Regions:
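Juxtamembrane luminal stem/stalk of type II transmembrane Golgi/ER carbohydrate-processing enzymes
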Residues: 151-176
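Short, flexible, basic/aromatic active-site loop/helix in glycosyltransferases
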Residues: 30-41
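Short C-terminal domain-edge/linker segments immediately following a structured domain
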Residues: 23-26, 54, 82-84, 173-176
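Short acidic/His/Gly/Ser-rich catalytic and metal-binding motifs that mark active-site loops
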Residues: 28-31, 62
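Structural alpha-beta junctions
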Residues: 13-19, 88-100, 165-170
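GT-A fold catalytic core of metal-dependent nucleotide-sugar glycosyltransferases
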Residues: 1-28, 49-52
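Hydrophobic transmembrane signal anchors and adjacent membrane-proximal interface regions, especially
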Residues: 11, 122-124, 133, 163-165, ...
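Catalytic core and acceptor-binding pocket of nucleotide-sugar-dependent glycosyltransferases
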Residues: 43-157
Length: 176
């Protein structure tokens, strides 16, 4: 779902070839969690469900994607494959990695929160026009409900004030 201004990509990520959604769940290989850069960030793991990038870079990367998928036993998940490519580029380019994550939810907001569970991300404040992340102090323009158990129907209810909350927290509505 798109909210806000889609031109943010150029403003925040013009020096990168590809930007992935950052999330709180290190999936599918939890052993890689300690290898990710920016350990101080909450949204530090790659989520392949949302990405934006330059067409030339993406087209150049597709053969690498195909190479990784040749071993299905090892690489059965597109998120795992993109994670491997991310780490390949990180090893090769270091801080100049052309692939990055949206660590501060400037564009993408993943609704999954590993700390609280599926669709229960308490960093987010919803209103009819925007979502606001209190932790990162950003207004992401795209939100993503990953996996089969994370539902945007709950988000729709909140945004449209159809979620019957009997004990409304001031904190929940402070940004509305």
């Amino acid at each position: 779902t798109f909210l806000n201004n889609q031109k943010r990509y150029k403003r925040y990520f013009k020096n990168y070839g590809l930007v992935f959604n950052g999330e709180t769940n290190c999936y599918p290989d939890k052993d890689l969690a300690v290898a990710y850069p920016h350990q101080d960030k909450k949204y530090k793991y790659l989520n392949a469900g949302m990405c934006m990038g330059r067409t030339d870079f993406i087209m150049e990367t597709f053969p690498k994607l195909k190479e990784h998928f040749t071993d299905y036993e090892k690489n059965w998940s597109e998120q795992g494959v993109w994670t491997n490519i991310f780490f390949d580029y990180l090893k090769k380019y270091g801080d100049d990695n052309p692939i990055t994550l949206d660590y501060d939810c400037k564009i993408f907001q993943c609704l999954w929160d590993e700390e609280w569970g599926r669709s229960a991300n308490f960093d987010i404040v919803y209103n009819k026009n925007k979502i606001y992340n209190k932790l990162t102090k950003t207004e992401p323009c795209v939100f993503h409900t990953p996996g089969p158990t994370c539902s945007d129907s709950q988000v729709w209810k909140i945004i449209n004030n159809k979620y019957h909350i009997t004990n409304r927290s001031e904190d929940f509505y402070e940004y509305i």
